[in-house]
């Protein structure tokens, strides 16, 4: 996500090289990251050994003001994919996610388009990102109806501050054989413990910039206190808070892989360190005490980018 924007190509190359040396072969980007610059950077970084990498990218997020600069229609997705292939400088993409749902649009056209992309050899598999549990099942039903392969992976926002995917998304994916690849295991940086309760965040941070998605979800004093509790516990175990948070996600047997978004080599090494420590029953109990299974860290935790649709009201008297 940060490659091509906050992370220079030189540093990104060092991170990718270190990842490859550590046995990593799965790399993820999106057409909307850094205005397309992230895809261009990833394409350059994997060009010398393309076949080593399982390459994932995403389409459907808003990238401009035009009517087909967003959404999951055939016309929009076709343009998104062709542009991604060009920026990545590849002939095919291993895993192509729908980055965002459009719950007001029937999925038949979308799934049929993805099937055509597979038959054309432009993508190998498709997946869903930020889709609700019932929409996963609907996508599978339509895929069966149209003779299209099932989605191979789901990319939910899942971490110790947001355990809501445990109620529907993760069980549904497991039941239907869909891999689960959570993003933002550090809860947009909150789980690193870098934010101090009661103190104004740094201007260069996501919270300091007033990003609505963090301000209306994790950035509340209760959550920041929880993050500090996790940080203290992790340090008593000889781990960083970030490594603990990543390890917590990976300890869930329903999780297939996890996305790391390092900005620096130090960040990347911090992610890798999560694999060096075990996870104990006491570790699990601590998080359960702070954030119960299936719940977010605080009441009213709603990502403004994904509206709650379960209460349309009748006309008032």
Predicted regions and their residues:
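N-terminal binding-site loop/beta-alpha segment at the start of enzyme catalytic domains
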Residues: 1-54, 119
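Terminal-tail/helix-coil boundary detector
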Residues: 203-232, 236, 254-255, 265, ...
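Glycine-rich beta-alpha junction loops
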Residues: 59-61, 132, 158-162, 184-191, ...
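Glycine/proline-rich, positively charged
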Residues: 4, 21, 64-164, 168, ...
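A short, structured active-site edge motif that brings together acidic residues
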Residues: 52-64, 155-156
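Generic structural signal for well-ordered alpha-helices
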Residues: 16, 39, 43, 81-85, ...
């Amino acid at each position: 996500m940060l490659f091509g924007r906050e992370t220079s190509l030189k540093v990104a190359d060092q991170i990718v090289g270190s990842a490859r040396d550590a046995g990593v072969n799965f790399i993820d980007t999106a057409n909307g990251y850094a205005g397309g610059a992230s895809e261009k950077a990833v394409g350059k970084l994997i060009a010398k050994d393309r076949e080593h990498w399982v390459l994932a990218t995403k389409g459907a997020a808003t990238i401009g003001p035009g009517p087909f600069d967003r959404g999951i229609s055939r016309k929009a997705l076709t343009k998104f994919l062709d542009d991604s292939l060009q920026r990545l400088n590849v002939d095919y993409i291993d895993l192509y996610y729908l980055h965002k749902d459009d719950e007001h649009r029937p999925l038949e056209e979308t799934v049929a388009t993805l099937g055509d992309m597979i038959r054309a050899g432009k993508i190998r598999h498709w997946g869903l990102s930020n889709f609700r549990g019932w929409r996963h099942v609907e996508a599978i039903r339509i895929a069966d109806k149209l003779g299209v392969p099932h989605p191979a992976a789901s990319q939910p926002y899942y971490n110790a501050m947001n355990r809501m995917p445990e109620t529907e998304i993760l069980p549904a994916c497991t039941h239907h054989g869909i891999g689960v690849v959570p993003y933002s295991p550090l809860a947009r940086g909150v789980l690193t413990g870098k934010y101090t309760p009661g103190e104004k965040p740094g201007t260069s941070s996501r919270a300091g910039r007033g990003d609505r998605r963090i301000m209306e979800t994790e950035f509340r004093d209760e959550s920041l206190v929880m993050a500090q509790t996790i940080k203290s516990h992790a340090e008593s175990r000889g781990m960083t808070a970030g490594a603990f948070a990543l390890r917590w996600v990976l300890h869930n047997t329903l999780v297939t892989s996890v996305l790391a978004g390092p900005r620096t080599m130090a960040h990347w090494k911090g992610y890798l360190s999560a694999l060096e420590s075990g996870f104990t029953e006491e570790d699990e109990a601590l998080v359960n005490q702070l954030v119960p299974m299936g719940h977010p860290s605080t009441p009213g935790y709603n990502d403004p980018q994904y509206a709650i649709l379960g209460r349309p009201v009748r006309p008032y008297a």
